[in-house]
Amino acid sequence: MSTTDTLPVTLDRITQAVEAVGLIPFVSNTGQVAAILPNRTIRIAVPEGHPAQGVADYPRFFDPSHADQIASAVRRLNASTYLPKVTSGTTETGAIALHLQHTFNWVVGATDDQVTAEVSQFIMAAVAMMNQLDIMFPDQWTKEGTNA
């Protein structure tokens, strides 16, 4: 049996992985790196002593009258995808918000290839899930008029 030593996963290594995906990382002084895309912001937080967390908030909110449809969509998406997982919650104004989350499993460290692959998978899967939500719940305000 052989062993492989792997380095701890740090904010710098995650930042390099975001760059390797071809995105510009935005690094905060709170231990987070973000990839900011048109209408999408995907963050990875690296809290000291805790697993890294990938998070993204869907940029739209839903009226409470759509709660059953949202709950059904959340169940279907979570049942059909490994990552990220999506949850719904109620905002202070009563609207329904959707939150995407993934906990990275790098307890004993990871190789550069592993970090890059998992960061890439999370970013691409989060964008794909948000695109699915866009298809399931079209935004009537973004449609072009017939005379546009």
Predicted regions mapped to residue ranges:
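Helix-rich interaction surfaces within compact, conserved domain-sized segments
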Residues: 119, 123-127
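A short acidic/glycine-rich loop-to-helix N-cap element
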Residues: 106-120
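Amphipathic alpha-helical hairpins
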Residues: 37, 92-93, 148
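Long, continuous compositionally biased terminal/linker segments
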Residues: 38-68
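Short, highly charged C-terminal tails/helix-capping segments
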Residues: 134-148
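Charge-rich, low-complexity N-terminal segments
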Residues: 1-45, 89
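A generic structural signal for beta-strand entry/edge sites
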Residues: 30-32, 49-53, 93-99
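Short, internal acidic amphipathic alpha-helical interface segments
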Residues: 57-101
